[in-house]
A protein has these predicted regions:
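Anionic group-transfer/hydrolysis microenvironments
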Residues: 30, 39-41, 54-56, 99-102, ...
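Mid-chain, well-packed structural core segment of small domains
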Residues: 60-92
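Acidic-basic catalytic patches of nuclease active cores, encompassing PD-(D/E)XK
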Residues: 1-29
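Domain-level recognition of nuclease-like catalytic cores that cleave nucleotide substrates
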Residues: 86-118
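Short acidic/glycine-enriched loop/turn segments that link adjacent beta-strands
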Residues: 34-36
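Conserved catalytic cores of phosphodiester-cleaving nucleases, focusing on short active-site segments
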Residues: 19, 38-64, 68, 76
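Hydrophobic "anchor" residues on beta-strands that sit immediately upstream
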Residues: 25, 48, 93
Length: 118
């Protein structure tokens, strides 16, 4: 596994633990279809939440959240609709969150959870 892939995978593990610690139920991780991939899908109460996870080793080139563009968010919304057509899940609404993770050389991961970004 490439170092970049390992960092991303670790970040997704941190994000899943983060939302589970807040009482979410994780429904899917790394769900793929021909249109793209969703990093994390979960239920926050009765709200279906689709999460884009961005992980970086530093903020030298900007924060991880800054890497999530409006174009990417539009794609995530389309993928969320596709996910819902393929899964029998009832939700009062759908929300898109971004979890931005910085992995410093020493110490714990820094997690920023941005809720309802679109």
């Amino acid at each position: 596994m490439r170092a970049k892939d390992a960092v991303g995978r670790y970040g997704e593990d941190v994000a899943a633990a983060h939302v589970e610690a807040r009482g979410w139920r994780v429904l899917d991780r790394n769900w793929r279809c021909r249109y793209g991939e969703l990093d994390l899908v979960g239920m926050d109460g009765d709200v279906l939440v689709v999460v884009e996870v961005k992980t970086r080793r530093s903020t030298a080139y900007g924060t991880p959240a800054e890497a999530v563009t409006w174009r990417k968010l539009a794609r995530i919304r389309r993928l969320a609709a596709q996910w819902l057509t393929e899964h029998d899940v009832r939700a009062s609404s759908v929300r898109v969150d971004v979890i931005a993770i910085v992995l410093p050389h020493a110490g714990a991961a820094q997690v920023e959870h941005l809720q309802g970004v679109c």
